[in-house]
Design a protein with these regions (language model features):
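Conserved double-stranded beta-helix
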Residues: 40-43, 47, 53-111
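Catalytic core of non-heme Fe(II) oxygenases with the double-stranded beta-helix
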Residues: 80-139, 145-152, 157-168
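Short helix-terminating capping/connector loops at secondary-structure junctions
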Residues: 35, 70, 146-147
Length: 169
């Protein structure tokens, strides 16, 4: 697949975005903590309230990725903090063909690298890329003593993807 990553401004309307950030900041300590990534995280199957915010993004994703058939697979909210916060180089191996990473909040920006290109996202900006095909990572977590970074990972796949029991099952 040939796709040029795209930065998307104002992923959410301002009032919706502010509500999402407020809910995530209040709730993150209730979610599982993954020591290997230095993050609290939860998916939208376990925290169904997240679906209120991610479901409306389907139309935007279809437009960005130029596919009228893609479907939402799952989303994850992640809150990174401390010395262990990291995201090593990887390609996704789950139902992440189309990925929209949205910056919810940050005290110090933490850039995202995709295929060797660095992206600094502002709050309510997203980066669209092919999560399963494009290597992506983050470098050292900036200001680990004070920094907190909230990210929303929204993933989409085609209907014949194994996630939906399709040809790749």
């Amino acid at each position: 697949m040939v796709f040029q990553e795209k930065v998307i401004d104002k992923v959410f309307p301002e009032t919706v975005f502010n509500q999402l950030v407020s809910v995530c900041k209040r709730q993150y300590k209730r979610f599982p903590y993954a020591e290997e990534f230095g993050r609290y995280f939860i998916n939208d199957k376990e925290w169904t309230a997240l679906q209120i915010y991610t479901s409306p993004l389907l139309g935007l994703a279809r437009e960005i990725f130029d596919s009228t058939t893609l479907e939402h697979s799952y989303s994850i909210f992640a809150h990174y903090e401390g010395n262990q916060a990291q995201l090593p180089k990887h390609k996704d191996n789950n139902a992440c063909t189309y990925t929209l990473d949205v910056c919810l909040y940050q005290q110090t920006p933490w850039s995202l690298w995709v295929e060797g290109k660095e992206y600094f996202l502002e709050e309510n900006q997203g980066l669209a890329f092919y999560g399963e095909d494009q290597e992506h990572w983050r470098e050292n977590f900036p200001n680990p003593v004070n920094n907190q970074v909230g990210q929303l990972f929204v993933h989409f796949v085609e209907p014949d993807h194994w996630f939906f029991g399709g040809k790749d099952a």
